[in-house]
C-alpha cells in the first residue's frame, strides 16, 4: 500500500532529473564549441559508390604549350613524270682541259699499235710458209674451196684482199706454184667485150694466154682462169674454180 502511494513521487523525480540534464546540455551548447551529449556512438561502414553521372560536354583547350613535332610519315608512291622543261641558256665557255693525261694514253696506245703491227708482220711471214706464196710485195693465199667468180670476189673483200691478179711473170709463177688446182684471176671483160680489165680498175698490162685464147667460146666467157701449166684461158664466170686472194705483203 505504501509502495503505490509513493509511485507518483518517484515518477516526478525521474522527470525532473531528465529535464534538468536536458537543460544543462542546452546551456552548455551555447557556451562550448563541441560538447557531446548523451551516450557516445561509433561511425557506421561506408556506403556503396553511386552510379556514374551523364557524360559532360567537351571542354575548351587547355593553356598548355604545343608539343614537339612528331617523326616523318612513310614516303608516298612516286608521282607521274612531268613534262620536259624548256632548254636552258647556253653556258659559259669552260677552261681548257688538261691534255697531259690524254697525251700519255695516246703515246701508250701508239706503242701497242706498233707491237701489234710487228706481230701481224710475223703472222704474215708464217702464212707465207703455211698458207700461201709471197712474190715481192704480194702474198697469195687460198682456202682450197671451189666457187663461182662472184663468191671469190666477196670472199676476198671480206678478208680485205682482192682476187689474185698477176701483173708480171714472177707473180704469175708464184700463183701457179701455190694453187693446187685451176684458179680464177682478178681479170674480166664483163664491162666491154674483148677488153680485159683488172677488177681493181685499170687495163691489163701483162698476159699469159694459152694459144688461140681468149676466144669467147659460146659467148659469155668473161672471166679468166690460171691453168696448172701457168697459161690463161677465158671461161664463164658462173663456173666454179679455186679461190685465190691477194694481200699486200
From Swiss-Prot:
One of its GO terms (cellular component) is collagen trimer. Detected in blood serum (at protein level). Expressed in liver. Weakly expressed in lung, testis and brain. Not detected in bone marrow and heart. Hydroxylated on lysine and proline residues within the collagen-like domain. Residues 1-20 form the signal peptide. The helical collagen-like domains from three protein chains assemble into a coiled coil and mediate trimerization. Residues 64-98 form the Collagen-like domain. The modification 4-hydroxyproline is found at residues 54, 61, 72, 78, 89. Residues 135-246 form the C-type lectin domain. Glycans are attached at residues 55, 58, 90, 93. Residues 41-102 are annotated as: Disordered. Transmembrane segments: none annotated. This is Mannose-binding protein A.
